[in-house]
Amino acid sequence: AFNDGKLEPAVVVPINGSPQDIAMSLSGKQCAVASPWSRQVTLVALENGTEGQTLPRKTAEARLPFAPGLQAFCRDDTLLVVADAFGGQLALVDPRNGKLLGTRLIEAHGIRGLAASRDGKSLHLSHQRIESAAPTTRNRVFWGQVISNILRSISVDHLLEDDGKRSGGAKLVAHWSLYPFGSPSKAAGDPGAVTVGTLGTTMVALGGVDRIGLRPKPGHVFEEIEVGDRPVAIALGPLERYGYVANFFDDSISVVDTAAAEVVRTISLGPERKLSSAEKGEKLFYDAKLSLDGWYSCHSCHPDGHTHGQLNDNLGDDTYGTPKRVPTLLGTSNTGPWGWIGNRTTLWEQVEKSIETTMRGGKPEPPTVEALVAYLELFDTSPPGNAAVDSSAVARGRQVFERLKCSKCHRPPTYTNVGTYDVGLQDETGQGFYNPPSLKGLQHRSSFLHDNRAATLSGALELHQPVSIRSLRRTDHADLLSF
């Protein structure tokens, strides 16, 4: 409600698991709420009260096999498409009952734009795609061969097809049209919000480089336009004459004349204040211009501080040809040393090396590193999920963990330590000694071990096989996984 110039809550609906995205149905009679950490989508009916007020009512909850992010209603509100908050999966949900109809997989991570065409026949996604085998040499980064920035359009009919071809339980999406953003010397890191008008106007936020892409009709080339600092949301006005772009870091709205393809007005949302070191670090974290030509930012591989879960060949272990899983940064300030082989003893050193050799942005100035470190120190571990947990199994699992002396490598409270250990899993160069990753937030990882060779935690234990686990009873094994 809007009272005396202030917005106030009119009705509060409890939603589990730290909700982060809301999508409205085309009719306006329903919304969907995504909660990434609990891997849940909550469906809410928006009913009219006797006095004209809106009365929200939870109608269903959909449990997903991945963390949900953006959502879009399609097909006259009979289909809800839910995008992966970190990786490249899509879920198809029946919004009438919350039933999961299936999951789909595309070669993607960082899906930050999702919009259905007005006729409901196509779905448009902005995302990035990493080439895990491509080393982060200057030449590879320059040509956009490490991370590409993409607008992908997929037929909704094709999404609903099921030919049985699967990868890890999800059907592979085989047909699409693809538009790559960026070119050498003028890349377009971190594509974000997408809006598609009824007349065919399409606008895409290029958040990492402070530009938007604009095309008047499908099939036309996008024209890139400079806007404010990190555009994150876009709306089209009547007759699509103007587009309105919300810029996150400078608190402004850019008004774009879509015919002239230029900003005609900038609306300030208030005076900017002096930023703390951590706030400066936040701006840098989302700034693709920190990399060579602007191909990608820290956020590209560590979406909102977490991880896209894929491999990157970035000299983290001082070698090429040995791609490793990108780790989460949540809680990272407490889990040193850094790097899979523990070869960075300070977070400062890790940040500096990442900018130089992963992003090829040159040697950063000390204030840049200082600000990024200050921002990373704010990252707490990811919250627990809300899935039903057997507390007695967790308690028994803790006892198994202690009895097997798992804490020798994974010491509470961070569940890691400063050493390196031979775990019997060598990389391409024969390297077998690794610094144990923290076990905090383990339930929010989609793959395990340094090269993602294990798709489940149980599979990781089978491959890792510490001596103490090899003769473990099945019930103790299950309890350990619960813990």
Please describe what each predicted stretch is.
Residues 40, 74, 88, 93-98, ...:
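Periplasmic c-type cytochrome electron-transfer domains
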Residues 12-16, 61-66, 104-107, 182-186, ...:
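Surface loop/turn motifs at the tips and blade-to-blade linkers of beta-strand repeat domains
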Residues 1-5, 43-48, 217:
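Beta-propeller blade repeat segments, especially FG-GAP/WD-type strand-to-loop junctions
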Residues 8-10, 52, 57-59, 101-102, ...:
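A structural motif specific to WD40 beta-propellers
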Residues 1, 17, 34-41, 61-62, ...:
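Contiguous, function-dense segments enriched for cysteine-driven chemistry
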Residues 5-6, 49-55, 78, 121, ...:
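Short, solvent-exposed loop/turn segments that connect beta-strands within catalytic domains
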